[in-house]
Amino acid sequence: MNGENLNLGTLVSETRNPATMTLDQLSTLEMMQVFNQEDRKVPEAIAQVLPAIAEAVDLATASLQAGGRLIYLGAGTSGRLGVLDASECPPTFGVPHGLVIGLIAGGPGALLKAVEGAEDDPALGEADLKALSLTATDMVIGLAASGRTPYVIGALRYARDVGCRTAAISCNPHSPIAQEAQVAISPVVGPEALTGSTRLKSGTAQKLVLNMISTGVMVKLGKVYQNLMVDVKATNVKLLDRACRIVVEATGADLDSARQALEQSDNDVKPAILMLLANIGVEAARERLKQHNGYLREALLGG
């Protein structure tokens, strides 16, 4: 893409912030106060786009219920944030690796070191999705603070051609990627404290939106009971302790009873909770959960 035609200076995320023009003259504390004041604008901006975020959650839920995947895709900071959110889903919600996927322009190496030119080719975005054998049941969410990254545009166009559900997260209004997606999520956080450094407010906004999407989807998929992560995989000492505390919180049982139930269920939290609340054995608990597609609340109510 010809850089002369971009005119990035017209983008909100690239303009200078009049409140931070003296950044290099401030004391350390004053500088931190300015950063904090700017960061306060992020949740306010997100509050304005909650309906779009909710729509994206519903679309992603439908894709996963149909056997599809949730795929995040971006370049630079945006790509890294998608990879981060995707990587947290298996341990937090017990979903298999590959159900939620993060792609970054330039491949895994770009997580640690910038890959020159990777974001400037729309064909690379399409190629990365083709490498995943994209199908119409998948959902693709493109991320770009500027809203005009060619890698993301190419990917969203290909996803649309395949018939996927799509969403775009950008921090500039009426952006090109927003026009390529079914749902446009555009929290306008204003100019950055450091001009053009979109790893700041724009990155924070994208991270918060991704948190909301993935957590919202997992709640709707039955991975949460009350506000407890009942599909957590106890793969280390910390998570085993958390699993035990979750069982205690959900059932009111004492610690020893919770541990015993977890031992019988091979550290699987949902059947352990059901065993204690319904006073049934582990196999009966597993069968009841299976009948209710893993939804613990329905299994408790349905009997």
From Swiss-Prot:
Detail the disulphide connectivity of this chain as listed in its UniProt entry: none
**Alphabetical UniProt keywords:** Carbohydrate metabolism, Lyase
Q: Active site: which residues?
A: 88 (proton donor), 119
An MF annotation (GO) of this entry? carbohydrate derivative binding
EC code? 4.2.1.126
According to its UniProt entry, the protein's GO biological process terms are:
1,6-anhydro-N-acetyl-beta-muramic acid catabolic process; amino sugar catabolic process; N-acetylmuramic acid catabolic process; peptidoglycan turnover
The question of whether Lipid biosynthesis is a record keyword is answered with no
Q: Do you know what upregulates this one? A: Induced by MurNAc 6-phosphate that releases the repressor MurR from the DNA. Repressed by MurR in the absence of MurNAc 6-phosphate.
Which is an annotated Pfam family here? GKRP_SIS_N
Recorded hits in SUPFAM superfamilies, A to Z, give:
SIS domain
The organism's superkingdom is given as Bacteria
List, for all copies, the residue spans of the domain called SIS: 60-223
| Pathway where this protein functions | Amino-sugar metabolism; 1,6-anhydro-N-acetylmuramate degradation; Amino-sugar metabolism; N-acetylmuramate degradation; Cell wall biogenesis; peptidoglycan recycling
InterPro entries per the UniProt record, alphabetical: Etherase_MurQ, Glucokinase_regulatory_CS, MURQ/GCKR, SIS_dom, SIS_dom_sf
Enzyme class at the top of the EC tree: lyase
Recite the other comments.
A lyase-type mechanism (elimination/hydration) is suggested for the cleavage of the lactyl ether bond of MurNAc 6-phosphate, with the formation of an alpha,beta-unsaturated aldehyde intermediate with (E)-stereochemistry, followed by the syn addition of water to give product.
Q: Which HAMAP family match?
A: MurQ (MF_00068)
What do we know about how this protein assembles, alone or with others?
Homodimer.
Give the record's family classification: Belongs to the GCKR-like family. MurNAc-6-P etherase subfamily.
Q: Under which name does UniProt file this protein?
A: N-acetylmuramic acid 6-phosphate etherase
Give the originating organism: Pectobacterium atrosepticum (strain SCRI 1043 / ATCC BAA-672)
Q: Which gene encodes it?
A: murQ
